[in-house]
Design a protein with these regions (language model features):
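NAD(P)H-binding glycine-rich loop region in Rossmannoid oxidoreductase-like domains
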Residues: 53-96
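N-terminal Rossmann NAD(P)H-binding glycine-rich loop of SDR-like oxidoreductase domains
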Residues: 2-24
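Glycine-rich NAD(P)-binding loop of the Rossmann-fold in SDR/ketoreductase-type enzymes
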Residues: 57, 88, 92-103, 134-137, ...
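C-terminal amphipathic/interface module of NAD(P)-dependent oxidoreductases
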Residues: 245-286
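NAD(P)-dependent short-chain dehydrogenase/reductase
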Residues: 140, 152-195, 201-202, 209
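Conserved Rossmann-fold NAD(P)-dependent oxidoreductase catalytic core, especially the SDR/UDP-sugar
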Residues: 102-138
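N-terminal Rossmann-fold cofactor-binding loop
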Residues: 31-41, 55-56, 79
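Mid/C-terminal beta-alpha module of Rossmann-like enzyme folds, strongest
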Residues: 206-209, 213-261
Length: 286
């Protein structure tokens, strides 16, 4: 049985990862959160393995957490939301996005643990799409640059999954899906904004079923679904969730940050389900 520590379980990804591993008897999953207020979002039975008051930017707090849990695997789900002001503040973005992953990797190496770190397609500008792991980052904003610096490309005990996510948040509506479902009347659907990420529940499944069983995997891998326009994505979500809303096609935003994940498929055998199936899964696990 692998002991898994999820950092940041109140975030959109962390909550899905904790839930996925918690439902599998083959893993003993622990999680961290900054405030005890977040405990109410989790079932009573799982709270004994949730550690509140953990500040991941405090070295002593991290060391104490690792010493208590003694994990085999650490999954870093701590991160900033690009749409919020903090993502533009160097004093906030750099410690969390750029420095924390490297500090975690060093601590994990000392405790003989494997680190799974999550990065983003925002390390790319979106000018061309179909990006490979070998493509150079050309992000022009602080968020994208800081996430790139935080990637772990060549450490034997760490794997970086570069991807993008959609899903449901625990306590807010900053995400695309929650924002869309909260709207009334009509919204714009960008027909030339291309996305290739995964629902959080599917990315959590990828980690559990395709990354953990391959301890030899390290370095950088793209994990992606088939590219889809945001217009078509919103249309599928509206249909699956029974949302009555007008989605107006808009070609003004042209951006393609889609990732090529053939290397990950060759290494693990993983191939993402179709988008209708992915949206169905997201709805079923909300």
């Amino acid at each position: 049985m692998a002991r898994v520590l999820v950092l940041g379980v109140t975030g959109m990804l962390g909550s899905a990862v904790f839930k996925t591993f918690n439902s599998d008897s083959e893993h003993e999953v622990w999680g961290t959160l900054r405030s005890s207020a977040g405990l109410r979002s989790f079932p009573e039975a799982s709270r004994e393995r949730l550690l509140s008051g953990v500040d991941v930017l405090d070295q002593d707090s991290l060391v104490a957490t690792l010493a208590k849990v003694r994990p085999d695997v650490v999954i870093n789900c701590v991160g900033l939301i690009k749409q919020l002001a903090d993502a533009k503040d160097p004093l906030t973005a750099l410690p969390i996005n750029a420095m924390l992953p490297h500090r975690l990797a060093r601590l994990c190496a000392l405790s003989d643990a494997r680190l799974i770190h999550i990065s983003t397609d925002c390390v790319f500008s979106g000018r061309k799409g179909g990006y490979l792991e070998s493509d150079l980052s050309d992000a022009e904003d602080l968020y994208g640059k800081s996430k790139y610096i935080g990637e772990l490309h060549d450490l034997p005990n760490a794997i970086t999954l570069r991807t993008s996510i959609i899903g449901h948040e625990l306590n807010s509506s900053h995400s695309l899906v929650d924002w869309f479902l909260s709207q009334e009347g009509s919204v714009r659907g960008f027909s030339k904004a291309i996305f290739s990420g995964l629902p959080t529940a599917e990315l959590a499944r990828v980690m559990k079923d395709f990354v953990l069983p391959h301890p030899e995997l390290n370095g950088l891998y793209h994990v992606a679904a088939e590219p889809i326009a945001k217009l078509d994505l919103l249309t599928l979500i509206a249909s699956q969730y029974g949302k009555s809303i007008e989605i107006r096609p808009d070609a003004a935003l042209v951006i393609d940050r889609s990732l090529n994940s053939e290397r990950f498929t060759q290494a693990t055998g993983y191939k993402a389900p179709t988008w209708p199936r992915l949206i169905e899964l997201m709805h079923a696990t909300r």
